[in-house]
Amino acid sequence: MTKNIGKITQIISAVVDVKFTNNSELPEILNALECYNDKQRIVLEVAQHIGDDTVRCIAMDSMEGLVRGVEVIDTGSPIRIPVGTETLGRIMNVVGEPIDGKGDIKSSNISSIYKPAPDFTNQSTERNILVTGIKVIDLLAPYTKGGKIGLFGGAGVGKTVLIMELINNVAKAHGGYTVFAGVGERTREGNDLYHEMIDSGVINLAEPEKSKVALVYGQMNEPPGARARVALSGLTIAESFRDMNEGQDVLFFVDNIFRFTQAGSEVSALLGRIPSAVGYQPTLATDMGELQERITSTKYGSITSVQAIYVPADDLTDPAPATSFAHLDATTVLSRQIAEFGIYPAVDPLDSNSQVLDPMIVGEEHYSVARQVQQVLQTYKSLQDIITILGMDELSEEDKLTVVRARKIQRFLSQPFHVAEVFTGAAGKFVNLADTIAGFKGLVEGKYDDLPEAAFYMVGTIDEAIEKAQTLK
C-alpha cells in the first residue's frame, strides 16, 4: 500500500495547511498526519477539507522550527494510543508518547481516541451507589457507578488530596483502576500530583503493574489541539479498563473540564468559525456531549468520572460550566470556610447534592438520616448570626441542643485519610455505608449528647468516637 504523502503549504499558529497532489486521496476528517521536525515526530489532526487537494489541520505539538515544504504522511486512522494495564503507573501525552522518562509503553493494545458511546442495549440502567468510604460523600452526596460528579473548589481546599483518597479507596474496595487526565494542568501541579501518588503508594515504581492509576497530561504550555483532545485520550484508556476481564469499575478524573472547553474555543477561533455566546465555539454542546456520553456504565463495567470544574468569575450561567451541569449526577462542593475550621475533607454538606439521594435508590433510612443531618446543619447556620451578636445564652433550650448536635455532626463529617497519613500521622479510615448511617442516625437522635465535641473530630466510625471520649475523660 502506497503512503499518502502531502506537503505543508501554510502555518498559522497551531493550524497547518497540507497539500496532497499526484492523484493522492485526501485524508479523512480526524485522521492523524505525521511529519518530522529535526527528528521530532509531530502529529497533526485533520479538521477541514479546503478545495480539492488541501486539508487544514490542528497541531498536537509545538510548531517551533517547522517550515513550509515539509513532507507529511497520512497515517490512515485517527490518533491511536496504547491502552491496557501497561499504562498503569505511567504518564503519557495526548498522542500516547511517554513523558515520564521511563522508556516506551510496550502495549499490544492500540486504540483510536474516537469511539462511539456504547449502544443503548449495552448500557446499564441500574443505579448502584459507589461506596467511597468517605462519610460526608456517602451520606449526603452519594456517587453512583457510571455517574458523573462535578468537583468544585478553589486553590488549597483539598481537591488533590480528595482525588487521591478516592483513587486509593476505590482501588481497595472495588479493585478498580483509575485514569487521571490533566487538561490544561499547570506543569508544577501535574508534577506534584505524580510525586504525591508515588509517596502515598498509588503509583508503585518498583512494580508498575501494581500501580492503581494511569496518567495522561496535556499541560498548559501545550498547543490548544493537545489540550482539546487529551480528555479523549484519557477516556480511551478508561474505556479499555472498563471492558477488560469481563468488566471493571473505573474511576476517571478530569482536571479541569473548563480548560477542555477553553481549548476547544481556541481551536474553533483558529479554524475561523464564527463564535457563539461569550466567544465560545458554536459546537460547545456537541464537544461536551461527545466526551460525556462515552462516560457510562455497560452491563459489564462502569466508568465513574470526577470532574474538577472551574467557574469563571463565579458565574454559574457562563456557557462553559452551564453546559457541563446538564451532564452531572452529583456535585461535591469544597468550601474554604470549612477548611479554615480544620475540618477535612472540606466538603460543604449543604451545597453538595446528588440525584441518587432518593429513597427509591438509597433506601428510606439513608435518605431520612441524610435529610435530618442537613436540617440540623441548616438550622445551626441560620442561628449563627444570633450566636455571634447575642451569644449562646439567648437561644431557647431546643436551639441550644440543635447547636450542640450540629457542632458534633460537623466534626464527625471530618475523617482521617490514608493518603494524608504522611503529614497528619493519623491512620486513614475507610468507613462502610452502614456504619456511616448508624453513626449519624445516633447523633441526630441524641444518643451521643453526653459525649464531648472533641471526641467526634477526625475519627472513622461512631465506635471510635466513643473510645476517644473515654480517653478524653
From Swiss-Prot:
The keyword Heme does not apply. It is found in: Cell inner membrane. Its main location: membrane. One of its GO terms (cellular component) is plasma membrane. ATP binds at G153, G154, A155, G156, V157, G158, K159, T160. Signal peptide: none annotated. InterPro entries: AAA+_ATPase (IPR003593), ATP-synt_VA_C (IPR055190), ATP_synth_F1_bsu (IPR005722), ATPase_a/bsu_AS (IPR020003), ATPase_alpha/beta_chains (IPR050053), ATPase_F1/V1/A1_a/bsu_N (IPR004100), ATPase_F1/V1/A1_a/bsu_N_sf (IPR036121), ATPase_F1/V1/A1_a/bsu_nucl-bd (IPR000194). Keywords: ATP synthesis, ATP-binding, Cell inner membrane, Cell membrane, CF(1), Hydrogen ion transport, Ion transport, Membrane, Nucleotide-binding, Translocase, Transport. Produces ATP from ADP in the presence of a proton gradient across the membrane. The catalytic sites are hosted primarily by the beta subunits. F-type ATPases have 2 components, CF(1) - the catalytic core - and CF(0) - the membrane proton channel. CF(1) has five subunits: alpha(3), beta(3), gamma(1), delta(1), epsilon(1). CF(0) has three main subunits: a(1), b(2) and c(9-12). The alpha and beta chains form an alternating ring which encloses part of the gamma chain. CF(1) is attached to CF(0) by a central stalk formed by the gamma and epsilon chains, while a peripheral stalk is formed by the delta and b chains. HAMAP family: ATP_synth_beta_bact. This is ATP synthase subunit beta. The gene is atpD.
